[in-house]
């Protein structure tokens, strides 16, 4: 995008299970209402048919559910290799809604103004209350969601990414299926010198939900946490990172079935292939630390 004389081209990827047709339509209408050049949208049916969508919206129906990263990667490639037919890709949850009409224009400006900006994480707010849940602020100091800052990860269903990032470091890790795939991409992007910003003025309305806490969730969270460390961390930090997360998990006093699923996932993370190992440089570890989140937590 840097040095572009014309306005950066923007696309959007939405994955759906086909079970929220009204919310999906409202989201697509909010994208169509954005100021500036129109945004090209691809809706990926992740193992399900895509409900009716407005004219001009492209749809891809996958025969099986590839998981969240797998579905998003299909959406990226629909915009050419690494998504590079466009300059910027938005990733939006199918039950979200862009609250304002200037969000895409703000994205264009942000990426044009800063060559090293790779990813922007939007603020998720409840449409009724306007409140943002702490877990939706992608940093350890989450008490003030109205404060924008540089961060070390981002929200998968409320972000914008420069497609040069995918071209350089690859897409999301398909095999994760669900949980921590954003942090895997974020760490690879940061290691390549890109920056990630959390912007409180770019808002995705999304109803407040409790995160699903079933056995499969606990298993994937633990397995992917191990994979994340094995794939991306310098060897001395792997046991530190996983030890800290084990203590934090135990401190939350999970139920016995949850703990059983978590430890099952932890074992699975060690006993199964995690994909290519590319440990980040120590200077990236230091950068993450300066940004407020050393990769031990």
Label every model-predicted segment:
Residues 1-30:
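N-proximal low-complexity "stem/linker" segments adjacent to membrane-targeting elements
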Residues 62-81:
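Glycine-rich, basic loop-to-helix element that forms the pyrophosphate-binding segment
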Residues 97, 101-132:
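Conserved donor NDP-sugar-binding/catalytic core segment of glycosyltransferases
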Residues 153-161, 165-170, 175-203:
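A short, conserved alpha-helix in the catalytic core of glycosyltransferases
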């Amino acid at each position: 995008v840097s040095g572009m004389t014309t306005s950066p081209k923007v696309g959007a990827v939405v994955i759906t299970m086909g079970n929220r047709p009204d919310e999906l339509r409202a989201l697509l209408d909010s994208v169509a209402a954005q100021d500036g050049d129109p945004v090209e949208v691809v809706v990926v049916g992740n193992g399900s048919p895509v409900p009716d969508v407005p004219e001009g919206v492209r749809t891809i129906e996958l025969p099986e559910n590839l998981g969240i990263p797998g579905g998003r990667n299909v959406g990226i490639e629909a915009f050419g290799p690494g998504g590079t037919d466009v300059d910027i890709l938005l990733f939006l949850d199918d039950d979200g809604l862009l609250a304002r009409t200037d969000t895409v224009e703000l994205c264009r400006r942000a990426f044009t103004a800063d060559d090293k900006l790779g990813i922007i994480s939007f603020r998720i707010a409840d449409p009724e209350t306007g409140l943002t849940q702490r877990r939706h602020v992608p940093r350890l100091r989450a008490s003030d969601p109205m404060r924008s800052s540089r961060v070390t990860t981002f929200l998968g269903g409320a972000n914008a990414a420069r497609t040069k990032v995918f071209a350089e470091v690859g897409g999301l890790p398909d095999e994760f299926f669900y949980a921590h795939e954003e942090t895997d991409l974020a760490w690879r992007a940061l290691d390549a010198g890109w920056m990630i910003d959390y912007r409180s003025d770019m808002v995705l309305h999304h109803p407040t939900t409790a995160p699903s806490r079933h056995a499969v969730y606990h298993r994937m969270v633990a397995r992917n946490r191990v994979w994340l460390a094995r794939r991306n961390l310098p060897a001395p930090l792997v046991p530190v990172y996983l030890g800290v997360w084990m203590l934090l998990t135990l401190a939350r006093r999970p139920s016995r079935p949850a703990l059983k699923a978590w430890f099952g996932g932890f074992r699975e993370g060690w006993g199964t292939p995690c994909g290519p190992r590319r440990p980040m440089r120590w200077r990236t570890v230091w950068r993450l630390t300066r940004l407020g989140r050393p990769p031990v937590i």
